[in-house]
Amino acid sequence: MSPARESGNNGATPVEPIAIIGIGCRFSGDATSPSDLWNMISKGRTGWSQNAGDRYKMDAFWHPKSDISGAFNTQGIHILKQNPAVFDNDFFGINGVEAKAMDPHHRLMLEVAYETFEDAGITMDRLEGSNTGVYCTGYSPDYDAMLSRAPESFPM
């Protein structure tokens, strides 16, 4: 990683590095880390599963005609094996009620962001109190839609 240089100083004085290079990931199947992903790909396996277990009722959406709105006609799914309800909220300083109300995607994002710092060799002690930003993205509005259908079940 090359250090950033302040503009106007002719490159004489290096300042703090501006990038941390690390990686974390979650993919379907057994790929819960970059090395797991590589192992899966290098052995010619995929994360496809014929059964989603109790996390997704495929039969409820299956229809032999692919043009039926809201239905699909696939025989399998790519799904994380990790249960998204399992989350160490205390580790992240989040109380139990707030953790239950969080979108599972956000919980996974916190875990993966932490693992990315670990992969980069950056400890939390080194980050604490620093002027550090983390940029990541993801979008899935389905959790909000589920909560709006049953607001009485919102854990508050």
Residue positions per predicted region:
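Serine/threonine-rich low-complexity intrinsically disordered regions
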Residues: 83, 123, 138-142
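ACP-dependent fatty acid/polyketide chain-elongation machinery
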Residues: 2-101, 106, 110, 114-118, ...
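A glycine-rich phosphate-binding loop feature that marks nucleotide/adenosyl-phosphate handling sites
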Residues: 54-62, 128-139
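Structural signature of cysteine-dependent C-C bond-forming condensing enzymes
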Residues: 3-8, 119-133, 145-156
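Generic beta-strand/beta-sheet core signal
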Residues: 21, 135-139, 144
